[in-house]
Amino acid sequence: MKFLVLAALLTAGTAASGVSPTALWQFRGMIQCTIPGSSPYLEFNGYGCYCGLGGSGTPVDELDRCCQTHDQCYTQAKKLSSCSFLVDNPYTNSYSYSCSGTTVTCSSKNKECEAFICDCDRKAAICFSKRPYNKEYKPISKYC
């Protein structure tokens, strides 16, 4: 639920200010690239113990483990001196990437923080595309 509120606020803020999409929306685009026809926020937010904002417990399956790894990657990004908390944090910093077929490529023109975040998102999107989706794990809270 918190993630959906955050997504709604980011959408409103982005639309109102006319700025480029934030990393969350770019992550959505990467998932749609690797899994054409998917609805990432509807399908993955609230899946397992780690997909969505926050996470705890033991991942329920390999797809949930993708989310746990993505969370850990963002934690590492926040430790970089180039990823400041307010401006260049993983949830709001935009980056450049391209999609060709189902292949995502991060731009070599990204700065250090942008490149790190882009790679976190790219690896997670690829991971999602290679793991089965188990409907019984959406939504889930009793195992976390």
UniProtKB/Swiss-Prot annotation:
GO terms for molecular function: bile acid binding; calcium ion binding; calcium-dependent phospholipase A2 activity; phospholipid binding; signaling receptor binding. Residues 1-15 form the signal peptide. Its EC number is 3.1.1.4. InterPro entries: PLipase_A2, PLipase_A2_Asp_AS, PLipase_A2_dom, PLipase_A2_dom_sf, PLipase_A2_His_AS. Its main location: secreted. The keyword Disulfide bond applies. The keyword Chloroplast does not apply. It is found in: Secreted. Residues 16-22 form a propeptide. It is an enzyme of class 3 (hydrolase). GO terms for biological process: arachidonate secretion; fatty acid biosynthetic process; lipid catabolic process; phosphatidylglycerol metabolic process; positive regulation of fibroblast proliferation; positive regulation of podocyte apoptotic process. Its cofactor is Ca(2+). It holds the Pfam family Phospholip_A2_1. It catalyses: a 1,2-diacyl-sn-glycero-3-phosphocholine + H2O = a 1-acyl-sn-glycero-3-phosphocholine + a fatty acid + H(+); 1,2-ditetradecanoyl-sn-glycero-3-phosphocholine + H2O = 1-tetradecanoyl-sn-glycero-3-phosphocholine + tetradecanoate + H(+); 1,2-dihexadecanoyl-sn-glycero-3-phosphocholine + H2O = 1-hexadecanoyl-sn-glycero-3-phosphocholine + hexadecanoate + H(+); 1-hexadecanoyl-2-(9Z-octadecenoyl)-sn-glycero-3-phosphocholine + H2O = 1-hexadecanoyl-sn-glycero-3-phosphocholine + (9Z)-octadecenoate + H(+). Ca(2+) binds at residues 50, 52, 54, 71. GO terms for cellular component: extracellular region. Binds 1 Ca(2+) ion per subunit. Disulfide bonds join 33-99, 49-144, 51-67, 66-127, 73-120, 83-113, 106-118. The active site is at residues 70, 121. SMART domains: PA2c. Keywords: Autocatalytic cleavage, Calcium, Disulfide bond, Hydrolase, Lipid metabolism, Metal-binding, Phospholipid metabolism, Secreted, Signal, Zymogen. Belongs to the phospholipase A2 family. Secretory calcium-dependent phospholipase A2 that primarily targets dietary phospholipids in the intestinal tract. Hydrolyzes the ester bond of the fatty acyl group attached at sn-2 position of phospholipids (phospholipase A2 activity) with preference for phosphatidylethanolamines and phosphatidylglycerols over phosphatidylcholines. May play a role in the biosynthesis of N-acyl ethanolamines that regulate energy metabolism and inflammation in the intestinal tract. This is Phospholipase A2.
